[in-house]
Amino acid sequence: MYPAHLLVLLAVCVSLLGASDIPPQPLNLVQFSSMIQCANHGRRPTSNYMDYGCYCGKGGSGTPVDELDRCCKIHDDCYGEAEKSQKCAPYWTWYTWKCGSDGPQCDDSKTGCQRFVCDCDATAAKCFAKAPYNKENYNIKTRCQ
């Protein structure tokens, strides 16, 4: 093998090692997004909830600013309980559900982590659908300290 080939091979190996440290996107968020659309019948895009209030989106702090933000805090707390009491990884837990006439419904045959996380998401999606959406509470993280 020529020295240039060895350098190329080494570069490929190093880049593959670096890529292995990049975590994949949580699968559960795809299901949660679909549940939200099921519950609100497509009236609001899921992206509207990604940076709303103090708790909708990644992390959360402060006091929820309204009913919708409280739904997000309850969902965050539910995921925390899933991690603590159920020893689940809620962002990675895949579950079975269907979209019924009254919103998302979890598969009754599932137990443990799958059912717990599904219930967290279904409850939140229904809560989102009932809560008013106030545009002035979108992208306000500076008020949530």
Curated annotation (Swiss-Prot):
SUPFAM superfamilies (UniProt xref): Phospholipase A2, PLA2 (SSF48619)
Keyword field contains Disulfide bond: yes
Signal peptide residues on this chain, from the entry's feature table: 1-19
CDD domains: PLA2c (cd00125)
Keywords: Calcium, Disulfide bond, Hemostasis impairing toxin, Hydrolase, Lipid degradation, Lipid metabolism, Metal-binding, Platelet aggregation inhibiting toxin, Secreted, Signal, Toxin
UniProt-annotated binding residues for Ca(2+): 55, 57, 59, 76
Function: Snake venom phospholipase A2 (PLA2) that inhibits collagen-induced platelet aggregation. PLA2 catalyzes the calcium-dependent hydrolysis of the 2-acyl groups in 3-sn-phosphoglycerides.
Protein name: Basic phospholipase A2 S6-45
Organism: Austrelaps superbus (Lowland copperhead snake)
